[in-house]
Amino acid sequence: MSNQPPIGVPQGAIRLNTDSQKLEFFAQDRWYEFATNTPNLDGGSRGFVCGGNVPGGKTNGIQSINFATLATDTGFGDITSSRGGPAGAASRTRGIAAGGGTPSRVDTIDFFTMATRFSGVSASDFGNLTSGRSFDGGGLSSETRAIFAGGTTPSNVNTIDFITIASTGNAVDYGDLSGTASQVGGVASPTRGIFFRPNTNLEFVTIASTGNSQDFGDLQSNASQCGNGYGNSIRGEYSGGNPSTPATARQSFIFATKGNASKFGDLLVTRDNHMSASSPTRCIIAGGTVSGSPSNQIEYVNPTTSGSAVDTNTSFANAPSGAAGLSNAHGGL
């Protein structure tokens, strides 16, 4: 479009430039492009811990951590009921906490808006799982779909359910794990989800399809009581757990390439029944049991580099274990 105005254009007139698709205003005999900026109103990249077991009972609390500053918010809001062992998943805007025990197993699926801090109950009813069960991990997601695997009813099951995160409604059968399992861990890239059962098996699903999980490779050690996994869009990790004695190892694998996990470093402490949350460059591992006692300590790793974890010098309240871990910046987005 011409930068010269037609005759009679008033000062302050506004137009859409059809060549640049930008808004312009007229001043001093010329058209000028508006300076525009879209502020980030979602609070930045944050991880969340929902529900879980705490000393003396269970909690419905939602707590958050800012990945950049490592500052925690221990009163972000609440899921709809106090329960241990929910599974977590998320898109960029919506967090999901599914199932758990009150102590009886529930089929409840809650959702909440991660950009909005609430006082009191902040989660809403999304729908129901195909059966009531407790996970202690077992969730993963892309931007559009969340998948939940295994758990106890109280018997161990191999069920895989999925939901479409942006909608509401009941979960739908996706397929089955290769065997029944409780305390299944999960982590995802945008296209592929990896589950690790309480043995050395790594199994994968293609998130956008349905069907049974398939063999991916093996961990170096048993994945019992490891909580959920973490990582970026290229690399997933599992760490800690209690194969026979609590462990510290970071075990890493590349989503696009099937094969065995390799050691990538260590956590600061032996930890099991913990929860994790991810951003592209910083992943937090928090809570759970450390040396047999409940812990509220948080450590972090960089998923792009090997090495030991770093203490955040921050903490979550009430030392949660078996909680849902999720974020608005994980590797599946």
Regions inferred by a protein language model and the residue ranges of each:
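Polar, enzyme-active/binding microenvironments
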Residues: 1-333
